[in-house]
Amino acid sequence: MAKKGTSAVWLRGFFGLFPAALLLAPATAQAPALSMLDHLQRGEWELRFRDGTPTRKICLRTGRELIQLRHPQSGCSQYIVEDTRNLVKVQYTCPGSGYGLTSIREETSSLVQVQSAGLAGSRAFDFTAEARRVGDCR
C-alpha cells in the first residue's frame, strides 16, 4: 500500500511539473517557409538556360517567381519538399495547366541555379538555368 501511495504522489508530482518544464525548455524558432528566397536581391533577373533556349528576363519581387517559371499563373497549390539555408525544392500543381518540381540553389544573393521539370499543358518540360540579377525592374 505504501508503494501505491508513493507512486500516486510521484505521478502527480511528475505531471504537475511536466507542463512547467515544457514552458522553461528553450524554444526553437521556426524560420519562415522558403526564407532563402527572401534573401535574394530584388530587381530584374536574367535566366540563362543550359539547353540553349533564349535568355529570359523576369522582375523578381519576392523570389517566389522562380518557382513556377512555366506556370506563372496564380491558383496553383505548392508543397515544400526541401527548405534549407541555400536550397529550396517545391512541388506545385496548377489545376488544368499541369505541375512541376523546382529546385533553387543560392550561390549568392544575386546568383541562383534553377532546375525544374514537369508538365505544362500537354507538354513535358525539363530545364536547368542560371538566374542572375542584372539591374532594377523596368
Where do the language-model regions lie?
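N-terminal secretory signal peptides that target proteins for export/translocation
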Residues: 1-10
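Bacterial N-terminal signal peptides
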Residues: 12-25
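Tryptophan-anchored aromatic micro-motifs
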Residues: 39-55
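Short beta-strand segments that buttress and anchor functional surface loops
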Residues: 45-48, 88-95, 104, 114-119
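Hydrophobic/aromatic beta-strand elements that line small-molecule binding cavities or substrate pockets
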Residues: 100-107, 115-116, 128-133
